[in-house]
Regions:
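Secretory targeting and sorting signals
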Residues: 2-26
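Accessory cap/linker subdomain of secreted extracellular hydrolases
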Residues: 104-108, 116, 179-288
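Alpha/beta-hydrolase fold nucleophile elbow
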Residues: 159-171
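Glycine-rich nucleophile elbow surrounding the catalytic serine of serine-hydrolase chemistry
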Residues: 169-179
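C-terminal, loop-rich substrate-recognition/catalytic regions characterized by aromatic stacking residues
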Residues: 329-588
Length: 588
């Protein structure tokens, strides 16, 4: 094990001269000892002031992007010297809910406070967005990725920069951060990214079904004119020019709707955009960059599988999964953990993160937001246990674990509502009594942990030539309350399985979902289909019951099948080929 270097320079800001340049060496905390365990890294701030300036920077094609810059300051003046830089590639140089980073205390939106710790922090509006000029061609296209390269290298060569640059973000800005990595800028040394997509099709049209919460930004001129302009543009002349350019941007909802298959070509952008906008397309470049990654997700986030798959395909990554919804972090000072990561990679401080386990995840027993200490576990790989998958048959008698033959029939209702589901990026699935077929198990005699990626393996009989099939893993409390823990879904016509082009968790089937792969159902004929269910780490408490519910519609669907309403779906249970779910039950 690499020996730790302990720093004992408490209360001191030293300035060294290297090659004739002033380099600020960080002041160490009062304890004098930096290396720390998870969630314990909290150095004393070096500065209590910062300067803020806004301006435009031209990209390699001449398009001007808006930048907001925070620099460490003393007595109202920016401190001389060179500092590491972290930056955020976003939709507006000022905080915006459209960025998806959330308002949580000590979360992503507060990483600007790292100027207090001796960092220059930059917010850059992506082209076609916010105060920046240009046209948004797609959503995380290669033009935008080139901008990320240009911005990184520009930041590295400024007089207040020491050339060590990191990037961060969550949600669409997490994708932007990862696309920056894919461009391999020479000065990019670390990326801290949360709740992003590894493969855009699997994230935004998982199972061939559009049932998430967004298409990307769509704005009117008056929306952009309501923004705060950059300094010197008090009459918003430049802001109006930029806003008018934005109106030429690709209509994203139309683009996504026009690509139901993974290999579809979009005439709006002139490419097969599911591939162009997917990090998985640039997996080799990301690995070749050797940029250290810290990947963050949440068990109630729609993209939690994407972070796991990214970690499986990028050696040396750190993966953190909390009990959270999209880009939220209650119960953890995320800024401090980000600083622990950046201090190691951008400042060379021994923060202990290099020796931390590659995977840290929360195990939960409730879908409620955490209010106390989080039960954190660590692992060297995913899934973290070697217990494998346990079969739970969907019995014809409606009992989970029963091999009784029979069928469970339901009628699809596309007008069901989900009370208290939330909205926007944190919308959740919910159990709607009677909306599908439910299979409930016996009351558990002991606490039962399920950690990993479940698999649904069901035989369906439908009176249409296609269907959207959803499977929910649920917890039934002793009082009868039903909580959806996780869910999976698949368009029946896209049930064909092929070898995945990148590593997936063990046993997870891959559906290529090319246009030529579509296989219509024969109405009334039993058809088998397998699909993964979003990963989980959950303890079903003794006295609770496990339940699986299968439906043909989810209230989050934005593009339901046109003839789904009123269709009949049967779940076929037969001892020779039972419908079942496979759960990664941890063995005690």
């Amino acid at each position: 094990m690499m020996s730790r270097i302990r720093w004992f320079l408490a209360g001191l800001i030293a300035v060294a001269v290297v090659a004739g340049l002033a380099v600020v060496v960080p002041r160490i905390g009062e304890s004098g000892e930096i290396a720390a365990d998870f969630a314990e890294y909290a150095p004393t701030p070096q500065f209590t002031e910062r300067t803020t300036e806004t301006f435009y920077v031209p990209m390699s094609d001449g398009t001007k992007l808006a930048v907001l810059l925070h620099r460490p300051a003393e007595n109202g003046q920016a401190v001389d010297g060179r500092f590491p830089v972290i930056w955020h590639h976003k939709l507006d140089i000022y905080p915006s809910p459209k960025d998806g980073v959330g308002p949580k205390e000590a979360g992503y939106s507060n990483l600007t406070s790292m100027s207090d710790q001796g960092y220059v922090v930059a917010q850059v509006a992506r082209r076609g967005n916010g105060q920046s000029f240009g046209v948004r061609r797609g959503y995380h296209d290669r033009v935008e990725a080139q901008d990320a390269y240009d911005v990184t290298e520009w930041l590295a060569t400024q007089p207040w920069s020491n050339g060590q640059v990191g990037v961060y973000g969550c949600s669409n800005t997490g994708d932007a951060a990862m696309h920056a990595v894919s461009m391999r800028p020479p000065h990019l040394k670390a990326a801290f990214a949360g709740c992003f997509s590894w493969n855009k099709y699997d994230a935004m049209r998982r199972g061939g079904i559009a049932a998430q919460w967004g298409y990307g930004p769509t704005r009117k001129v008056e929306d952009d004119l309501a923004l705060t302009p950059v300094s010197g543009d008090d009459d918003k002349t430049l802001l109006r020019q930029a806003a008018e350019q934005h109106q030429l941007s690709t209509p994203l909802a139309q683009m996504w709707a026009g690509m139901p298959y993974r290999d579809d070509y979009s005439t709006l952008v002139g490419s097969r955009f599911w591939a162009e906008g997917s990090l998985s397309t640039y997996a080799d470049q990301i690995r070749e960059s050797q940029v250290p990654l810290y990947i963050v997700g949440g068990w109630r986030d729609e993209f939690r599988d994407q972070g796991i798959v990214t970690a499986l395909n990028t050696s040396g990554s750190k993966l953190l999964i909390g009990p959270w919804r999209h880009c939220e972090n209650p119960g953890l000072a995320l800024v401090q953990e980000a600083q622990r990561f950046f201090d190691f990679h951008l400042k060379g401080i021994d923060t202990g993160i290099d020796e931390a386990p590659p995977i840290r995840y929360a195990i939960v027993d409730s879908i409620d937001d955490p209010t106390g200490d989080i039960d954190w576990r660590t692992a060297e790989s995913w899934p973290p246990t070697s217990s494998g998958l346990t079969d739970f048959a969907l019995g014809g008698d409606g009992v989970l674990g029963s091999t009784a033959p029979g069928t469970s029939r339901f009628t699809v209702d596309t007008v069901v509502e989900c009370p208290d589901a939330g909205e926007g990026s944190t919308v959740q699935p919910c159990h709607v009594p009677g909306a599908g077929a439910s299979f409930v198990g016996a009351a558990l005699e002991k606490d039962t942990e399920v950690t990993g990626t479940p698999i649904a393996d069901v035989t369906v009989r439908v009176d249409r030539d296609d269907a959207h099939i959803f499977a929910y893993i649920e917890d039934v409390a002793p009082d009868g309350t039903v909580s959806v823990i996780t869910e999976g879904r698949l368009t029946a016509s896209l049930r064909g399985e092929t070898e995945a082009p990148y590593e997936l968790p063990a046993e997870v089937p891959f559906h290529r979902s090319y246009r030529e792969d579509a296989q219509s159902l024969t109405p009334g004929e039993a058809t088998r289909m397998r699909f993964d269910i979003l990963p989980m780490s959950y303890v079903f408490r003794a006295g609770h019951r496990m339940q699986v519910t299968v439906t043909g519609y989810d209230q989050r669907e934005t593009i339901p099948l046109p003839d789904a309403q009123g269709s009949s779906v049967e779940i076929v249970s037969d001892p020779s080929a039972p419908s079942l779910v496979q759960l990664p039950v941890a063995q005690s």
